[in-house]
Amino acid sequence: MKERVFLDTNVLVYLFDADDPAKQRCVQDLLSNRELWARLILSTQVLQEFYVSVTRKLATPLDPEAAFQAVQDLAAFPVVQIDPSLILLAIQRSRKAKVSFWDALILEAALAAGATLLYSEDF
């Protein structure tokens, strides 16, 4: 069985960030591998953060309708639902490993989905 691959929010945001062409190209190269698509996993946190980031945090933000369509497209991939048990695990990991809660939650979602590879700029 091929490894499952979890994408952090920042990876997806760079796909739409024309102000950072080097990172944008890196993500385009990564996602040009169609074989990878069958192994991708996201989480509800990733979808939420993605929408906010591409509509509010980019120098040239996406219009809300384009961002909605992007989230709708991303939601076609397997999506880990963030539930109270993952939140509690993330709190524990964040305290023990001294990482941000949000990064710990990404990691817990990836682990819950059985991901063996996590793409992020935060780890």
Role assignments for model-derived ranges:
Residues 45, 51-78:
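Active-site-proximal, substrate-binding regions of enzyme catalytic domains
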Residues 15, 33-37, 53-57, 74-78, ...:
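Alpha-helix C-capping/helix-to-loop hinge sites
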Residues 11-13, 52, 86, 106:
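Hydrophobic side chains within alpha-helical segments
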Residues 3, 77-121:
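Active-site neighborhoods of divalent-metal-dependent phosphate/nucleic-acid chemistry enzymes
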Residues 12, 47-48, 87, 112:
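Alpha-helix N-cap/helix-start and coil->helix boundary motif
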Residues 1-42, 57-65:
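Short, well-structured N-terminal submotif of metal-dependent ribonuclease cores
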